[in-house]
UniProtKB/Swiss-Prot annotation:
UniProt entry keywords in alphabetical sequence: ATP-binding, Cytoplasm, Ligase, Nucleotide-binding, Pantothenate biosynthesis
Protein name (record): Pantothenate synthetase
Annotated positions binding ATP: 30-37, 147-150, 176, 184-187
EC top class named in words: ligase
Active-site annotation: H37
GO biological process terms held by the UniProt record: pantothenate biosynthetic process
Native organism: Geobacter metallireducens (strain ATCC 53774 / DSM 7210 / GS-15)
Note: The reaction proceeds by a bi uni uni bi ping pong mechanism.
InterPro entries, A to Z: Pantoate_ligase (IPR003721), Pantoate_ligase_C (IPR042176), Rossmann-like_a/b/a_fold (IPR014729)
GO CC annotation terms, alphabetical: cytosol
Amino acid sequence: MRIIETVAEMQAFSREARREGKSISLVPTMGFLHEGHASLMIEGKKRADILVTSIFVNPTQFGPTEDFDAYPRDLARDRNVAETAGVDVIFAPKASDMYPRGFQTYVNVEELTRPLCGASRPGHFQGVTTVVAKLLNIVLPHVALFGKKDFQQLAVIRRMAADLNMDVEIVGMPIVREADGLAMSSRNAYLGPEERKNALCLSRALATARDLFLDGERSVGTLRDKVLRVIGEVPGAVIDYADFRDGDTLETVETANGRTLIALAVKIGKTRLIDNCILGEEQ
């Protein structure tokens, strides 16, 4: 496995690989890799000759009061996870290389970034789309893989790639969960033992609403009330949003169907966690 730390070297590597007729897959990450990331890498390995994983804690997607400095970093651990999953190249650039002096160009997707995380984290998605656009231009992948836990992010990146005629396939992969249902996330490392137990309210609320839907309930108001009640029973759980949206457009809905998205953002202690499900899809 090769580690590349500069934009110039990564671009040269990718151009040479393409000249040789090799296909490239990319799994963009912020590091502190877990089994959810590994599942993306394993799929990426199947889809291309060369699998690249980027590890870059992107400063432009963090707000001034968010956890950029505290975000967990462990490159040695990440190397082990990546190598085990079959990664060929780790691209781990420095912020000064990705955003050199004088940088002033940003990518912004309009409508899709306004609700949900876009409403509670101003500027977040501009940072996400900008860094992903840069990674796609640098690595030149034929396919890029993202987890569906960040459902809105996936929708935004797909929109950006389509709108800007980017010659890359964007693939969304299922949420990977712990045995007790908690969605895998690098931020789970922040949780203390009691908070870890309380964090199960997200997946429990989703499962409860989905069971009601499968039993025939279609009223979003009724389903939302149930979600709020399940989370509200947990001490210290603070809801950022518990929203029902169309799974394709992210527009609000009043009547649920199989493509309805339930999207949650909940603070457990100081840790903000997100989770989601599509009501008609198996979890």
